[in-house]
Swiss-Prot record:
It comes from Tolumonas auensis (strain DSM 9187 / NBRC 110442 / TA 4). Binds to DNA and alters its conformation. May be involved in regulation of gene expression, nucleoid organization and DNA protection. Its main location: cytoplasm. Keywords: Cytoplasm, DNA-binding. This is Nucleoid-associated protein Tola_2216. The keyword DNA-binding applies. It is found in: Cytoplasm, Nucleoid. Belongs to the YbaB/EbfC family. One of its GO terms (molecular function) is DNA binding. GO terms for cellular component: bacterial nucleoid; cytosol.
Length: 110
């Protein structure tokens, strides 16, 4: 069914992919991505695992006394950062899988 050495080859490939995925997980954990809103007036930097590292708010926004607008800008910056992190994760995953499309909803074990 697998041919001569086929099963051993398959197991070796699976082990190599597992090692590459572990390395990618380590890289993602170290990665930092910054999202912005309000033309850069609010910036949020997160890790690949979506932990917030830094929030930067332009001082002029603090003088406006418009809490709702500031809250919206913070939420938008966070969402932008998450989107960027997901794009980078997807690109790294494509490197490992050789561009092979994974099923929708497939989650990495991290």
């Amino acid at each position: 069914m697998f041919g001569k050495g086929g099963m051993g080859n398959l197991m070796k490939q699976a082990q190599m992919m597992q090692e590459r995925m572990q390395k990618m997980q380590e890289e993602v954990a170290k990665m930092e991505v910054t999202g912005e809103s309000g033309a850069g007036m609010v910036k949020i930097t997160i890790t690949g695992s979506h932990n917030v590292r830094r929030v930067t708010i332009d001082p002029s926004l603090l003088q406006d006394d418009d809490q709702e607008m500031l809250e919206d800008l913070i939420a938008a910056a966070f969402n932008d950062a998450v989107r960027r992190a997901e794009e980078q994760n997807k690109a790294k995953m494509a490197e490992i899988t050789g561009g092979m499309q994974l099923p929708p909803g497939f989650k990495m074990p991290f």
